[in-house]
């Protein structure tokens, strides 16, 4: 199950927050502040005391308890940061937008393994790393644009590619498509597309849940899980439009270099 602290946090910390909205840490904070989020927002940057009007802490250790962290710092600093958040700050929701993990080299893959091990120990959930983020009707935890006005009757969009998320949102918004949630899972180090489908299935409410799901996949960690929950959602009246990339040799190389995906014939 996906932790409630990721889905509906009462407090969010942006680690690596910036006043420069051209940087991920700046655009994340801007999008979060402009979203529907009603909880507490904290920022961390060792060089700042205030970022975009929000009090800034110089160290993660100085933060109060926080439900969810959106992390935009160099990969090498992420394992220790996650460790502090998970074990000292009670954090269970994590979005890591930083690159430099399993998609890059073995050292990055080791960082990823350490992070997942830590988050699993506290029963938390991770989107990413190497992603553009996550947004639902509770808050926007993404650094890309455009950010759609979310609609409970819109589609749930799940993608392994942040660039594809941007393209689909841009094209969809100009053609009348609305969104209920957008999950850009990146490397899928812990939460993958099949886990999002499981969440959409097990929390499905015929009165309030979206009936349309769009999926762009670069890898499938657990094909049987994906099929099980896809079938269940379809039986509940949902429609699913899915594309699996990486079928050709060129596509496989692109997926591997992009998110570390090992494309197969699935």
Label the model's feature ranges.
Residues 1-266:
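Catalytic-core regions of core metabolic enzymes
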């Amino acid at each position: 199950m996906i932790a409630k602290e990721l889905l509906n946090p009462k407090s969010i910390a942006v680690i690596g927050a910036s006043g420069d909205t051209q940087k991920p840490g700046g655009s994340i904070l801007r999008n979060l502040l402009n979203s529907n989020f009603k909880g507490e927002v904290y920022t961390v940057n060792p060089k700042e005391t205030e970022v975009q009007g929000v009090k800034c802490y110089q160290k993660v250790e100085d933060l109060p308890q926080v439900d969810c962290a959106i992390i935009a710092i160099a990969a090498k600093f992420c394992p220790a940061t996650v460790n502090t958040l998970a074990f000292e700050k009670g954090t269970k929701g994590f979005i890591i937008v930083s690159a430099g993990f399993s998609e890059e080299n073995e050292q990055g893959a080791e960082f990823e393994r350490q992070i997942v091990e830590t988050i699993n120990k506290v029963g938390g959930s991770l989107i990413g790393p190497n992603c553009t983020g996550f947004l639902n009707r509770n808050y926007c935890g993404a650094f890309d644009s455009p950010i759609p006005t979310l609609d409970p009757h819109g589609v749930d969009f799940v993608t392994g590619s942040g660039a594809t998320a941007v393209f689909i949102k841009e094209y969809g918004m100009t053609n009348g498509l609305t969104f209920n949630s957008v999950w850009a899972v990146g490397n899928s180090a812990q939460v993958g597309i099949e886990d999002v489908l499981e969440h959409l299935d097990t929390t499905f409410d015929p009165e309030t849940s979206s009936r349309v799901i769009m999926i762009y996949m670069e890898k499938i960690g657990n094909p049987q899980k994906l099929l099980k929950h896809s079938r269940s959602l379809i039986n509940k009246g949902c429609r699913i439009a899915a594309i699996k990339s990486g079928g050709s040799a060129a596509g496989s190389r692109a997926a591997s270099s992009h998110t570390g995906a090992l494309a197969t014939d699935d």
